[in-house]
Amino acid sequence: MFQVVYFQVFNQHIVIHLITQFKKIIHFLFKNYKWAKKMKAAGIKIIYSIPGLKVHAKIALIKRKEINRIQYYSVLATGNFNESTAKFYTDHILFTTQKNLVKEMELLFIFLAYRKKADQFPCLQFNHLLVAQFNLQQKFISLINREIENANKGIPGRIVIKLNNLEEKVLIQKLYDASNAGVQVQLIVRSICCLIPGVKNMSENITVTRIVDRNLEHGRIFIFHNNGNTEIYMGSADWMNRNIYRRIEVCFPIPDEKIKKQLTEIINIQLSDSVKAVSLNNVLENIPVIATNNPVQSQKMIC
């Protein structure tokens, strides 16, 4: 694997530097191999993903023997279980015994244990989890379409999405369709954003902001107004080609109203940030958000 870096020198020629990543890859391979050996020695079964299909989902299923019964616990997250990144990444974790999620987590782990591709399991269905390679993109399209249908009926439509990266063309086009239908779309995109906001007859109802502060914004949150019956999802998937088409990703619904309220409050604070936020204009320039009377620094308020 090579990283290609382009930069322009004083004589206006483009110089291409190939920077090898072999040492970095070898380091991680050796580290993973070392830990795999230790875990195997302790009696832990290791299942490797198949080549060409990265498992990017951040999930765990815990089976615990309790008094007179076996209890399952699902852990579903937006970020890695990593002691290093946990120091400066902001992420969210749902810890639940909700039976529908537990059941589908079991199905997903069974699928991963077979080490096959998704198209070899045409009968495997997920009705609650959103799993890339199975139903993730289709479900998000359906959720956007519902907001469009409501807007066409005169019912206010609203979508709020927080991502690291936004690149995948099909989902971007659906957001344009939503904007043209009158749906208010608010995006918080930390890094890559291929959607152009604020263009008349294309994206005039879409705003894009990003927050760069002490901690790296890493969570993925998806909020759909649904005529007042708000649905909220979180998960591991950015809207990029690699996440949608070449990885196993998991997004999951938030069933608890208290958690929904908490997440909505967090997102509203971030949308109000006037200290560390910038907005993207229709030529994708970062425009600082100017504080008015009461400046808001979202990370300080949330922490």
Per-region residue spans from a language model:
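Prokaryote-biased recognition of long, low-complexity C-terminal linker/tail segments
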Residues: K87, L107-A118
